[in-house]
Every structure is written in C-alpha cells, then in structure tokens.
Amino acid sequence: MAAPFAFEHRAEFLPESSDDLLRSIPAAPGVFALRGADPAAEPYLTRAADLRRRLRRLLAPPEALDENGQPVPSKRLNLRARIHWIEWTRTGSDFESTLLLYRAARSAFGPDEARRRLRLHAPYVLRITMSQPHPRVYSTNRLSKKSLRESFGPFPSRATAERYCDAVLDLFLLRRCYEDLEPYPEHPGCVYGEMNKCMQPCKEGNPQACTPEQYAREAQRVFDFFLTRGQSLLDEVAAQRDAASEAMDFEAAAALHKQWEKVRAASLQADELVRPIDQLRALILQEAAPLEDETRPEAAAVFLFQHGHLCGPQRLSTLGVRAVREQTAVGSSLFAQPLMLAPIPLNEPAPIQIAQNNPVILSEGPERAGRVEGPQPKNPEGPPTTQTAPSFLATTPEDRARAAIDALAMHTESAPDMAEFCDHLSLLRRWYYRPEKQRAGEVFLPTPDGAWPIRRILNGAARVALGPPAPISPADREAAKALKTRIIHAGREGVEREVPLLPKRPRTRKAVTPDDLV
C-alpha cells in the first residue's frame, strides 16, 4: 500500500501575521491546500504556477471598505476568515504538479472524486481476444486484469485507435464482426468475406471457409504484429521479396516491395508508446524543484511508469554530465568543444546517514526528505524504508542513473487496483500526447532487450536540468564599418586598400627623454 499523503510544508495561518507567512512561501509552481479549523472538513485544493501570488489573492485582506470600516462584498473568492492551516509543496514542472494534485485529491476526497476533479478517463486501447475461439480486434477503454496481456496502447483517442486497427486488419484476414460466432456451413457471412478480406470462420464446415487451426494461426500473426509493432510482418514480407529477387522474378519482387511499404505505413500509424499494456514501461524526465540552498537546479526529476504505477519524483544529479550535454549539442570535436577540456567535479557530497527512527522514502532522496515538515514525506508510491539510498553512494553518472531507476522500481512491485491503474495510465497518456511544443520534459522507453538506455537518459537529464547550450553570438560584421579607416598605398593599382585605425593607447606617464637620464 502507498504511504499516506502529506505535503512538504504546513503552517498555521493567522490574519495578523499573514504578510510574513505569505512572504515565506516561494513564488514558484506547486500544489497547496487550505484547511479550516475542523480537520474533518474538505480542504480547498488546487495547483498554481505561482504559489505566493495565488495565496495572496485568496488570503489578502479586502481592498475596499465602507464608511463603517467593514469590507465591501466582492465577487472575488476570499478565504481569509475561514482558513486556519496552509499546506503546500513546491514542484518543478507541470507534470509533477498534476501528479501531486492527483495524489492529494485522492487522499482528501477519495479516488472517485479525484478522478472527477481531474477529468481522468481510461485511455483507448486495442484488444485482440486471443482467449476466445474466434479472436477479433476492437477498440475499448474498459480494462481488466484478464485483458491486460491482450491489450495494446494507449492511444490518444478512439478515432486514432480505430484508424490503426483498420490499417492493420487490411493486412490480414481476421474477422471484423462483433457477434459471438456460432459457426455452421450455411452461415450467410458478411461483406468482408465476399471481398476476400476475411477467412469466414462463421462458415466452419463449408469448403470455402477456413479450419479452426488456420484461423488460430492467422490470429497469432496479428497478435505478433501488435507485439512487435509490425516488425514480424515486415521481416516476413522482406524475406519473400528477397527470395523472389534471387529467383529472378522481379515482378513478384516489385509487388512484394509495395506490400512491404504498405505494412510499413500501417506500422507507423502507432506511436512509440503503443506497447502491450501489461509490459508498458516509460521513464519521464522533468525539471526538478530546486532545493532551499540551491540557486540553480543541477538535477532532473525522474518519474517511472511500470506495472501500472506512476511513481516519483526521484532526483538525478547532473554532476559530471556537463560534457555529455555539450557533446550532444554540437558534436565531440575538441575544437568545437573547448569546455570538454575543463575539469569537472566527479565527487558528490557525503551521503546523509538516516537514523532508524527517521524513515525516508528512496523515491524522494535525502535532499527533499530533509525539507519535509511533518511525520510523513510527500506521497511516494511505496512503503517507507530506513535504509540509505544507494543512489547517493554512487560516484559515476551511470551508477546514479541506475540507482535512481532501481529506487523507483522498488515501489512498482505490487500491482495496483484497476481503477488506479487506469488513472496513472490516463495521466501518462495526457502528458505524452500533448503537442511537442507544449510537452515539457523527455520520455524514454526500454530497448527491445528490456534494458534502459542509460547514456541517452543522462543526456536527456542534462538537457532538462541545464537547458540547451547557449547559442554562439553571431559575428558583428557591421561593427568594423564604424571604425576610423585609412587608405594606404593610395593611387597604386592592385595595392591600394582601406584598413581600420586602431585606437591610440592612453599615455599613463610622461615620456622620458635622453636628457632626463643624464
């Protein structure tokens, strides 16, 4: 079970000292809750791009007073007279704010109300019913534990899922009808059977129909297509094309090449995130919220989606990764990269020893844990532990990245209930399918062998935390025109030219003549 949620900071609100309290709240993005004196009452919970500005608007004294000194009623919401406690947590990105708001709403109002407030809906997926006698493919947004291994997604919308489904089914002879088949030889069939786009399993026993074994093999080919994102059929058609080319049957090879291009176009309609739902894993990098003693953030926030859990953030330090960031920008040439010759500190600060009576969540790290005010840290997805985080004992960037991923993976071992699974999947889908210019951060998927691309993750962390390299200032070619010039070798053809005059050096002391030395 997940640990109880708690904000990082909690302060008592007193109207007479509200100015000092509001000045102590950072003018940065975050999530906050306003509570009254009754602990059982529902809080005012929301997120803000500027915590201090939003709280001033809600808790500032009224600006207009009548002749008796009483505040004039205003349409603006003001909770100054109702609030007793303020709780807040600073975040580093919009993605972290959304995830934190979901956890806070789930803890305060329950899962159903949190889902309604954040407008979370299960994303659409494609399911191929391999457990049925006559499998078919259809789009749905109803997930169950039984259907996870047969579902592929998520897709941004139902229309996108159905468009991809139609493109894939055009490559195979799987049925498209939705009825529960009871085959018999005199079955009327459908229009797809008449167009030779279906194997007609409904006419079992008819010479024109297929056998159950043939239909099962065709269904397995479709399942392999979804599983490999089209690579299985691409390899099959490419092998047939090469065989036809070697046999000098160039017409057949050309037709197979067109078929290969059609398969390729169909496979590209699915985004890279479309995977088997039960095997979906994604690592998201966002800008981390700076620590209290940091003037400039030097770490990225890591989030992990695995086994239906979306956990994080885990801070990943970019110490020693500056050269990697510069190399990804303009190449590995030392002529173009003079900063790569500069020394880079490779030692991290001494690890913080955690006492047995002060538990810390590994997904938060000791830096953020030191800022927690209260008995519980900000809700990580997993039980608390008392061991020191291994990521802060690592010395190389690769070791720190692996340790951060392992720390997050510890909280994804137990499968969540399907409602929470769908909520986390919806949060991932909502962020991933944003327009590229509006989607802050980077996402990484595992390699085909299941390993994480550590080097690419470090490059992405450097880009997220340090920002893109500053562009080289362009040469000002017009500046030379403003300088005083002089023509030398005037009148000599081919030799005459105009050169700028350098400014004279200011005289610092009186000139010394030979007579002064006698």
Identify what each model region corresponds to.
Residues 1-247, 251-361, 379, 385-518:
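Conserved catalytic/ligand-binding micro-motifs in nucleotide and anionic cofactor chemistry
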Residues 365-367, 371-378, 382:
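A cross-taxon signal for low-complexity, glycine/charged-rich
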